Amino acid sequence: MGAAGFLWLLPPLLLAAASYSGAATDQRAGSPASGPPLQPREPLSYSRLQRKSLAVDFVVPSLFRVYARDLLLPQPRSPSEPEAGGLEARGSLALDCEPLLRLLGPLPGISWADGASSPSPEAGPTLSRVLKGGSVRKLRRAKQLVLELGEETILEGCIGPPEEVAAVGILQFNLSELFSWWILHGEGRLRIRLMPEKKASEVGREGRLSSAIRASQPRLLFQIFGTGHSSMESPSETPSPPGTFMWNLTWTMKDSFPFLSHRSRYGLECSFDFPCELEYSPPLHNHGNQSWSWRHVPSEEASRMNLLDGPEAEHSQEMPRGSFLLLNTSADSKHTILSPWMRSSSDHCTLAVSVHRHLQPSGRYVAQLLPHNEAGREILLVPTPGKHGWTVLQGRVGRPANPFRVALEYISSGNRSLSAVDFFALKNCSEGTSPGSKMALQSSFTCWNGTVLQLGQACDFHQDCAQGEDEGQLCSKLPAGFYCNFENGFCGWTQSPLSPHMPRWQVRTLRDAHSQGHQGRALLLSTTDILASEGATVTSATFPAPMKNSPCELRMSWLIRGVLRGNVSLVLVENKTGKEQSRTVWHVATDEGLSLWQHTVLSLLDVTDRFWLQIVTWWGPGSRATVGFDNISISLDCYLTISGEEKMSLNSVPKSRNLFEKNPNKESKSWANISGPTPIFDPTVHWLFTTCGASGPHGPTQAQCNNAYQNSNLSVVVGSEGPLKGVQIWKVPATDTYSISGYGAAGGKGGKNTMMRSHGVSVLGIFNLEKGDTLYILVGQQGEDACPRANQLIQKVCVGENNVIEEEIRVNRSVHEWAGGGGGGGGATYVFKMKDGVPVPLIIAAGGGGRAYGAKTETFHPERLESNSSVLGLNGNSGAAGGGGGWNDNTSLLWAGKSLLEGAAGGHSCPQAMKKWGWETRGGFGGGGGGCSSGGGGGGYIGGNAASNNDPEMDGEDGVSFISPLGILYTPALKVMEGHGEVNIKHYLNCSHCEVDECHMDPESHKVICFCDHGTVLADDGVSCIVSPTPEPHLPLSLILSVVTSALVAALVLAFSGIMIVYRRKHQELQAMQMELQSPEYKLSKLRTSTIMTDYNPNYCFAGKTSSISDLKEVPRKNITLIRGLGHGAFGEVYEGQVSGMPNDPSPLQVAVKTLPEVCSEQDELDFLMEALIISKFNHQNIVRCIGVSLQALPRFILLELMAGGDLKSFLRETRPRPNQPTSLAMLDLLHVARDIACGCQYLEENHFIHRDIAARNCLLTCPGAGRIAKIGDFGMARDIYRASYYRKGGCAMLPVKWMPPEAFMEGIFTSKTDTWSFGVLLWEIFSLGYMPYPSKSNQEVLEFVTSGGRMDPPKNCPGPVYRIMTQCWQHQPEDRPNFAIILERIEYCTQDPDVINTALPIEYGPVVEEEEKVPMRPKDPEGMPPLLVSPQPAKHEEASAAPQPAALTAPGPSVKKPPGAGAGAGAGAGAGPVPRGAADRGHVNMAFSQPNPPPELHKGPGSRNKPTSLWNPTYGSWFTEKPAKKTHPPPGAEPQARAGAAEGGWTGPGAGPRRAEAALLLEPSALSATMKEVPLFRLRHFPCGNVNYGYQQQGLPLEATAAPGDTMLKSKNKVTQPGP
């Protein structure tokens, strides 16, 4: 078949390709320019799954930023410094335009179909167009920068705007601002994601765009350069070099070889629309019609060939844009398509190739799988029928362990053959998270003349730039050790501490050496004058960890001159987490040096942590050499370059000897270049040394060991005399690294504790041993047990039938006569060498101490380990029992264990035990101490101590273990042995490369296989562990939905039912509780368990100490009996009760029980508990004593001492002298009551406690008769300040205004002087016999009265000295008020003054007590019930003229006769200063005592006016009595004068006009300023705690009742004109 045959087959081929490309694959789409309708939009979920895998991610590690900043960038310049000489950072993202424009199809004026690589490459450098990249703000917010590339961006970047259509070769995004910010100020890594634009996505569009992006070779370009250098944007500029050269570095990040292909779960996909990553054999040609190679045939070219039949319209519809891979050959050959390197993590990885099936008879297709470093295998291809003559060949690739490539071969039949391939793909080759591309960060250094060098060529002591700017000044600024020529000293290299006679490394000039251009100073070591074998080590500075996969190199020059009978090694020590690993990276051993400087470059691979270098030199006698090093440098590639390639094959395992862990302080000899082959050892071979069947204090014999080892690989020589008697001598079979495990012997058991013994210690170390080395091994033997014994007497002690030892202990508290019963100490295991006839210890595993006769079961003796051979190996201290033997000590005691140099024999039993009953418990061979009643000490490097006194409970101590500095401790010392000791020697298998540091060697393949923890399996790399994949069962979606729906419905039904049941139950309980609480009698027997919590204020304390709930004395409820009710308190009912079962009081104690209702708020519970805490902390005869509390059951109780006399106020009112009722009270009784309260206040003052409410209502009496004692009994106002919630209180607070000083209610200041003021008011209450202070004044009026300087007049018949105490307590300044010690002293003076105590009490003519007490009580809920206030009613005019005006009220001016004692009080009050206006008409006016004979008409009248109407707040309120009286006709003009006088005084009395009933009684500036114009401004202040109500008056409720405007009794007060101040 000729060329005509090919043309005949081409039209149906292209027609079929047109159909298949739209139906069989999802990677083809119609061209918008050609007219076909758009394909359906891609589903959103499908797009989301693929978008991440379609992106190209550039991730620059954060370490790059850190290293670039530390190595290259100077410190940030201040704004004032010049810009010249500084460094700048720039960045860009570049893509080739050719693959991107191919995706868009034919464009007007631009032709890419001819295969041109770029437009006009001969015109000069490749042109580029720069687009704006992302912003720093976006990067900082999203932690990454996403650049979306679509058709519009491609047209803008590669073609330009419509007015200037000019194709360029490179599309760039400017990232300079972003990179500059990140390198200077950023944190974390820099992530830039380039992905297809999502706008108007069509089926397959994003996949094609992603492939085009990858084919355009996206690369990230960074540059750091000095000002004036050429940059990425202007590489052609070559300025003149300045005096000081700066860095000019460029980085390119792009996908690295061999893993170039797209990583996603769809693998590689190539439809030949644009260049793919496939390789072709023979090479691909796009020009001409070669008959021997593959060729692209675009659809446009087929259209121009006019090969299709039919109308023109059909051509455009059936031939979409795109290309096909065609092959036309007549040769008998193979043509291959080769995929890039791939990886597969899925068993479903499949190869899919679309070919034309009509061409199949002319040739055949064969697929090959080519794994890395493995033989290839054929992939079976199975055809799948397609449309229009096309078929898809599919073959299973699977999951190869190594990277692989796939080759598709077309084998022609010899005749003219035609092959057409439309689609080549590797699908479903990854599961889970995509592994991502391997990005390489390539670095370069630009010279001033434009020469570009690799970064590794800079700072390598070799001048590559014409002017030498790649060396010298720039490199010398690197950190210490990076660039070292030793011209300025050691460059951070240090030497290990050496003795004075040891040779030292020196920095000096070496003369008479063939320098070959080398001049200057170097690091030198001379061995000429050293006769013995020695070594010297010098250590470099510490270097940071290199970047992962960086081409890190070490460059150095070295020289050996003279004869060196030894070797020189360069060791790299890596600082791993918790340990150090070292490996030899360079080694040389020679007899005679060449005296030439030699340059060496070493690759530093697999360094993942901080590291340092060590130069280790060893030489023997006869060495006369000089060793030198110079020009040592670490390549900058270590920290500024990422190769992106794996440095180790995935199936290779690290050599254990290369990862051997060494002690950095150890000067060990390198064994890398020892002559002779390295032996391949059998990992199952080991040498186990035992006691050879010997036991007791002496070691084995040669015959015993011959019998014990006759069937093993061991051959030992046993010492027969001297210190080596019983020591096994063994020759090392081969030079290698060995692990030596030493196990000390256990101690003997005691007579009474036969369950546990003290275990021997295990020590495992790693040592380098040479073939023929002699090891001396002493295996420790177990100490003898005390029981069982053949001696019948001793056996009876063992079984407990004989207690003679216990009897002696009971009588004498020690054991002497019947000594014995303690176990012997265990022997230590010694492994040592001989050096010049002197033993040198390698490993010593200590023996366990012997248990004592009566040893305790649980004892713990920590393991002790020594590694310093300069510590003396002494024997343990001996007492009655023997101490353990050490390394090189002497002893003369028979029962003490011997040291190794004395033969290490075990000690005998103590002499008394042998003499009394022959109880022998000897120590084990290896220095175990003999036992007595106490245990013997264990052997070791330092022997264990025995008890100094024969304590039958004191065990012997374990010995101290030892490991030589020549070895490495592999495991810590552990107590594990329960019998005789052992020594196990085997080849060391290093497992430090494994993730869990555990491994084993396969006996057949001799490969190291790592172990993994439970639940994990070994990964393919043979090192790391991964979670074993467990197939998750997939249930049907319908079943899952039905189960979830059913569960949800059931949960809702159960929840609703539960809520209804709980609600109904709670409702019933609440109803029952309400009925119970509303019942007349409360069932006190109903008790339930409960707890209460509170928090006290840490700023306050009681009596100088803090308080807590635990300080309260809890009284069991069963000991409390309630007798009768006493009344209602602040919280609940108060009962009289009895408490039985009190300590030191057999009779029941009478108490008062304060209760807290079960149903109460949390605030009430906290207040109740705080009051109990306060009262319980006081201990004074004048403060009510707290007997205890009962808080564990409901209702909660506070038990106080029973005060049968009641409260003081009620007592005074009930015992007032009346005309028909004389009283037994005298003035002295009132003074005694005042003295008692002052004593209690003094106690509170001394303990820094502020009561805040000293009033008669809060004081209680022990009894009403003679001998009464007054006590302070209520701390209600003190609760808040001593609770943490005091500072959180807001809103309305209740304050006892009439007992408070001005600074308290004006500024909220409470001190002990506050209680002094309150005590003065209390005195007024006592000597007025229970009257309310400030009679007839409301709280608001009291505020105005006190702040204006007014004070109360003395009560009737009040002695002058007593009133003087009151006035002193009422001083305006707190510091002028006396303390309670002075008050108590003055009261004592009053009790001794005859004029005071003989003063008669006034006779009461007012209403009886029963009438006064008929006042409304405080409701439980103050807000639930309006206060019972009496509204003022206008008096009838006819009643105004009925009653005459009382004489006492007609002339209250200066002409009025003052009551007795008033003169003294007035004098005291006048001494304080002039009375302000407004205080004169109400100051010192006492309405209660100005009416000695009240007219009986006051109690007559219709309705409610024939009895006084009073408002009394039992806690903080005030008395107000509205007493109707018959009015008399005042003299003409009297009333106007009174009103004028009141107005002139600035105060309107009750008769001046009614107040508004709805006004709130609050202290507001407007209220005071309106009524007190002459008061200074400093007195008009806000309260710091918000609104404050006085006397339970809430905002919006009426004030206290005031008199009617027509009340003559009150009007008469206003008729008198007071003189002005």
From Swiss-Prot:
Q: Where is the signal peptide?
A: 1-18
Bias (Gly residues) occurs at: 1462-1472, 1543-1552
Major location, coarse class? membrane
The way it spans or sits in the membrane comes to: Single-pass type I membrane protein
Q: Where is this region: EGF-like?
A: 991-1029
Positions of the MAM domain: 268-431, 482-640
Control of this protein's activity is summarized as:
Activated upon ALKAL2 ligand-binding. ALKAL2-driven activation is coupled with heparin-binding. Following ligand-binding, homodimerizes and autophosphorylates, activating its kinase activity. Inactivated through dephosphorylation by receptor protein tyrosine phosphatase beta and zeta complex (PTPRB/PTPRZ1) when there is no stimulation by a ligand.
Compositionally biased, Basic and acidic residues: which spans? 1414-1423
Describe the inactivation phenotype: Mice display a decrease in newborn neurons and defects in brain function. Mice show an age-dependent increase in basal hippocampal progenitor proliferation and alterations in behavioral tests. Mice lacking both Alk and Ltk show a strong reduction in newborn neurons. Mutants develop a thin phenotype at the age of 5 weeks, persisting into adulthood with reduced body adiposity, elevated adiponectin levels and improved glucose homeostasis, while having unaltered food intake and activity.
Q: Where is this protein localized, as stated in its record? A: Cell membrane
Say which family it is in. Answer: Belongs to the protein kinase superfamily. Tyr protein kinase family. Insulin receptor subfamily.
The protein, known as: ALK tyrosine kinase receptor
- Identify the coding gene: Alk
